[in-house]
């Protein structure tokens, strides 16, 4: 089945699908390929993806987001804040159709795009909410979830104040972070505790599949 209702200009060059994609997305590989094509074309034209990122979409964006499912139990609820063009929420939803995922995005043009992708790829496990995670109306719509994810949204302390109120007591925020994560933990430890966060862990996922595994920070909500 081809998912052609996502706009993709004719004659566009697409990278060969890397072998790791089949391992990560399994039976939903075709959906992942369609999402890659959409980001490379429509996503780039609409300003969601920079032109220099297009050749690196698989490795730097889609695969490293898809593998975060390794850190999640079966059938849980997930909220992805500041979802943008759907990273990490869309790859996660494709890789883990058992998860119930809410994408939270404040900008209209991006939330419209997310709904287009959801419909085009038949992602029945995805809900899109336009708004900011810190807004009361959004918190009421989302309710409490098992895990809140994010990618390149904000410094760690601010991220904790936005994420943890959406998490059930005992649940976690799981954020994609870079090499400076330990420095962020040291700098923002007080703000994290104030937000109700504890049991901070840093680990990697995707070691067996990716040349550069994904670094995650996990913070449990205590109160």
Curated annotation (Swiss-Prot):
Entries under InterPro entries matching the protein: rRNA_ssu_MeTfrase_G, SAM-dependent_MTases_sf
Keyword Chaperone recorded: no
Keywords, alphabetical: Cytoplasm, Methyltransferase, rRNA processing, S-adenosyl-L-methionine, Transferase
Annotated localization: Cytoplasm
GO molecular function, one term: rRNA (guanine-N7-)-methyltransferase activity
Protein EC: 2.1.1.-
Domain of life of the source: Bacteria
Pfam families linked to this entry: GidB
Main location: cytoplasm
Binding site for S-adenosyl-L-methionine: 82, 87, 133-134, 151
Gene3D superfamilies, alphabetized: Vaccinia Virus protein VP39 (3.40.50.150)
First-level EC class: transferase
Function: Specifically methylates the N7 position of guanine in position 518 of 16S rRNA.
Record family assignment: Belongs to the methyltransferase superfamily. RNA methyltransferase RsmG family.
Protein name in UniProt: Ribosomal RNA small subunit methyltransferase G
